[in-house]
Amino acid sequence: MSNLISINNPINTKSQIQHELEALEIYNLKEIQEQKELVRSFWLDLVKPSEVMMSCFDDAFEEVMFGAVIWALNQDPNFPKVVTISRVPHKINNQNIPGSRWGIDNPDSVYRVIPIGESQSYVIRGKLGKQLFNENHFTLWDENMKTIGLISGNDIKVDSKNNFEIFVNPKSNERGKNHIQTSSGAKEFYIRDTMIDWLNDRPNMLEIEIIEASRSGKGFDKKKRLRTVKAYMQKWAANTTRWNQQALSKPVNEFSFKIDRDTD
């Protein structure tokens, strides 16, 4: 736990910095830029935006595409990382890092993701902040972002210094421990810290360890990583359009929406 306690900014970790710099390098590859233009054409043809919509498309599109790269590069369940997604533009060593805001960008929340395999075992270690957040969930998703496991930050057992461990594995019971059971289709953790007081609060400190004996393969090679990035760029455009379809299909200023996670 000692390395967790020393972190002043739980988002700006060494792992996060390395991940974002790698994402920027891959994002600028000719192959990925060509894919971006294909997705751009696909998206515009699918939505057919108005002039007003088009006026704010370009900047938002860049963030969605870079956000897809950030997320796609953390998909290997045998070599998981804690990665913060949906960030505003910022700098690393005077290098501009694009924003990665996508989906429902809530400025009061910090979102992090961890890839998980259904048969592997992990330990999520962390340290809770000084006060509980309005919302702090460790949600285990399947491929379609449907919840198959959950533990609330309010229910996590901690030590005297607010440190904790969450055991993630296929076992049905871990008595006396923070535990989430994996099941068929388990894909990743989606972790949300909703801040109350930005002057005094800090996101929870987090790190992930895979139990070595459960590791089932080598890391993704470059070809697979690039294929995954391309797939996510396409997926992010398609999903954003799907989620916005109720607004796109209604007259201007019509807000009678129905939210149904099974069909939206």
Residue ranges and their predicted role:
Residues 2-264:
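A compositional/structural signature for long, glycine/proline-rich flexible linkers
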